[in-house]
Each structure stands twice: as structure tokens, then as C-alpha cells.
């Protein structure tokens, strides 16, 4: 997968629903936040970490931004625009037995120290809820790890903020004729999400320099390749 597929720029999505989780967290302003309850990271920070754990160290401990950040925001904005043109969202929701939805939801957790935006929160006939994400991409016979983990993190936040069961999620590939894939969300997935969030917080709060497996595929276009040792 490309680097642009692995990063979700969460602050160019426009107005939407915001869960009432306290003024000190604020909106999804594109950076992690310091609050009275500690550091609040973004879902996109977790996806950066999964791509390469050292991204977090360079961005937040050394305060070296990515030069590509603005380009990713432009790509995400284009993705949203193209998705709106290509997808019959009402038909899609009905096919998933959705009885109610909230769109473009900013959602956060002080307890878990994470925030982000969900394209849609679906409330289903069986009494559960599910996140739905739209990707301006083709389905490649598998769901990328970062795609799934984005949905797992969203499920974690939906469960806490809405006090509702979330055992699955959906991803719509708009360039594959709006193909929708269902992703199972397990207890193991949620525990792994909590573990990774804590690993990221340790890097930011303690200044830990993480080990990483060098990958020529990932490193060749990395904006930090000249300083990473």
C-alpha cells in the first residue's frame, strides 16, 4: 500500500456531529492535544504508528512535521468529493439494515486518550452500531491492516460514547462499484487497540525512541529517511 493510503487526514471533512466529551479536548484540529486528563492522540497517529513507529517520535518528540501533510489533506478532500459523486449512500445503508445514521462524527475518549472522525455511525436493526468508512480506492482482494485498524479504533470510541455494542464495521470501496466489505470486530481487536494506544502515549510522554524493522519499500520515500538511524 502507498503512504497516502495509510494516513487519514481528519481535519478537512467539514462540519458534522460532535459527541459531547468536554471542551478541553476540542475539535479534530489535526494535532494531538494536551488536556487535564493527559495526552489525546488522533486515530491517524495510530495509523502512522502502524506504518512506522518512528513517525510518532519524529513528529511529537522532535517536533519535525511531515512535508507531505498538506498533500495528504488535499488527497483526502478529493476522496470525499469523489465519494459523494459515486456512491448511492441511501441504497447502501438500506442494504446493511441501517435504521439511523450520523455522518462525519467527531468522537473522542478522555479515558482512552484518543480522538478522530467517523464517516458514518450506523445504527442497525439488531440493536448494535457499526462504523462505515468510504475509501476512494479499488478493492485489492484484501483489506489493508491500516483500514481495518481505523475501523477497530472507531468501534472502540463508538462503544464508549454511545454505550452500544459494536461487533462489526463496514468499508466501502467506491472505485470497485461501491463494494462494501464487512469487518468483524472482536474483543481481541479492541484489546490490541488499547495496547497500541498506550505504546504511542509512552513514546510521546516519555520520549522513547522506538525500534523499527527497516523496510526498503517504506523507507525509500520517507520524509525522515535522512535522519533515521
Predicted features by range, described:
Residues 96-198:
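Mg2+/Mn2+-dependent nuclease catalytic core
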Residues 1-131, 138:
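Metal-dependent nuclease catalytic cores that hydrolyze phosphodiester bonds in DNA/RNA
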Residues 26, 188-213:
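Short, charged low-complexity linear segments at domain edges
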Residues 48-51, 59-60, 191, 195-202, ...:
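Charged/polar, solvent-exposed surface patches and flexible loops
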Residues 159, 201, 205, 227:
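Hydrophobic/aromatic-lined pockets within catalytic cores
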Residues 45, 52-56, 208-229:
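Cysteine-cluster motifs in flexible loop/terminal segments that predominantly coordinate metals
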Residues 92-94, 164-165, 179-180, 214-220, ...:
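A general structural signal for short secondary-structure boundary/capping elements
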Residues 43, 54-55, 166, 190, ...:
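Alpha-helix initiation and N-capping motif
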